[in-house]
Design a protein with these regions (language model features):
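Hydrophobic anchor at the beta1->P-loop junction of P-loop NTPases
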Residues: 4-6
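Walker A/P-loop
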Residues: 15
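ATP-dependent NMP and nucleoside kinases share a basic, alpha-helical "lid"
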Residues: 94-101, 106-142
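P-loop (Walker A) phosphate-binding loop of NTP-binding proteins
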Residues: 9, 21
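ATP-binding Walker
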Residues: 12
Length: 150
């Protein structure tokens, strides 16, 4: 099994590349989906986030993602702290998901922050998907149903 890292910014076309390779039999793991699952299910990680950022989970232990985003995206040090907490969990869960597809000759690891997270170290090859800024903006507007002003 070969692991191919797939990276690029929002709207570059990573999803299109992944869909075409999956149609040819490649496996696929989406780092963003792994993170969302961890946010919903991993009590240890949620507890660490709640301790670090003070009250970002409710009484049922559900993560308040907008509250966490407001904290970390307004302070680069807090964003780094978030990444330091979550990266080991994302890495382990991603590798587990990749190895669960070991029957596939190729598994794509779709991670927008592949290099920043150090995930390139377990990839055999890397594909960086690029697109002009205007194209990316147009795709995001269409994909997310946004207005031009958004």
């Amino acid at each position: 099994m070969k692991i191919i890292g797939l990276t690029g910014g929002s709207g570059t076309g990573k999803g299109t590349v992944a869909a075409r390779m999956r149609a040819l039999g490649a496996g696929w793991v989406d780092a963003d989906a792994v993170y969302r699952t961890l946010c919903a299910e991993n009590r240890e990680m949620l507890s660490a986030l709640d301790t670090a950022f003070g009250g970002v989970t409710d009484a049922n232990g559900v993560l308040d993602r907008p509250k966490l985003a407001k904290i970390v995206f307004s302070d680069p040090a807090k964003l780094q702290q978030l990444n330091e907490i979550t990266t080991p969990y994302i890495r382990k869960a991603s590798l587990d998901a990749i190895h669960a597809q070991s029957a596939c000759p190729i598994v794509l690891y779709d991670a927008p922050t592949l290099f920043e997270a150090g995930a390139d170290d377990f990839c055999d090859k890397i594909i960086a998907v690029l697109a002009p800024h205007d194209t990316r903006v147009a795709r995001i507007i269409e994909r997310d149903g946004l207005s031009d002003e958004a």
